[in-house]
Design a protein with these regions (language model features):
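N-terminal catalytic cores of peptidoglycan-degrading enzymes
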Residues: 1-81
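Basic/polar, cationic surfaces and motifs that engage anionic cell-wall
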Residues: 15-16, 95-201
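Structural preference for beta-strand elements that scaffold enzyme active sites
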Residues: 21, 82-84, 168-170
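Short catalytic/ligand-binding loop motif for oxyanion handling, primarily in non-cytosolic enzymes
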Residues: 32, 62, 92-95, 177-179
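Flexible, solvent-exposed short loops/turns enriched in glycine
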Residues: 76-79, 92-93, 104-106
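Short loop/turn segments at strand-loop or loop-helix junctions that form parts
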Residues: 85-90
């Protein structure tokens, strides 16, 4: 297993060893704010805790043991059967009128160069970093081997009926068209190639 910083939460909903899916999501805020929110259970009790968080610099933080689960999704069977990985990323971005910067839906400011692609009524996206991609690929490779999860990835751009019954690596956006994570800025082809490459570690 790759180097992982453990910050294990005691706020779990249950345990189940057998896992079918890895679900990718994003934080919608910088990693420090997100981890603080998870730790302090803000917003009336923050129960949507992922198993792992991967920062922009590729650092992996583990929040739950893989056999545990939280109320990340409203459907309990999805929570039981999945390992959830949240990537530090602001998601979709929009230009602030008059001012020369971009923000996401909660008002976090983005100062870099956005990824541009029209999808679900949005045009600008916070890019994922190469360090994130490599850390995610290494982690996913370990997890699919350990939990006998299928080595296949479903892209971001489609909502799939009964996606919870599928095996492999999926996105939060595959469950409901309201969700935009993982976004078009994420390269699923590269992730798949890393995971299937026996030389990649």
């Amino acid at each position: 297993m790759h180097n992982i910083i453990e910050q294990i939460s005691s706020n779990i909903s249950g345990k189940q060893k057998k896992k079918k899916q890895i679900i990718l999501s994003h934080t919608s805020r910088d990693v420090e704010e997100y981890l603080s929110m998870v730790k302090n259970r803000m917003n009336g009790g923050f129960k949507r805790i992922p198993h792992f968080v991967i920062s922009k610099d590729g650092t992996i933080i583990q929040k739950l043991r893989t056999e545990s689960y939280s109320d990340y999704f409203d459907e309990i069977n999805v929570n039981r059967n999945s390992i959830i990985i949240s990537l530090e990323n602001l998601g979709w971005l929009e230009k602030v009128p008059v001012k020369n910067y971009l923000t996401n839906w909660i008002g976090n400011i983005y100062n870099g160069t956005p990824y541009e692609k029209k999808w679900r009524d949005y045009f600008l996206w916070d890019p994922y970093t190469d360090r994130q991609m490599k850390s995610l690929a290494g982690l996913c490779k370990d997890l699919v081997d350990e939990h006998k999860i299928e080595k296949k990835c479903v892209g971001h751009n489609t909502t799939i009926k009964d996606v919870e019954k599928m095996g492999g690596i999926v996105s939060r956006s595959n469950f409901d068209k309201r969700f935009t994570d993982i976004s078009p800025a994420f390269n699923f082809e590269k992730l798949t190639n890393y995971i299937q490459d026996e030389q990649f570690v």
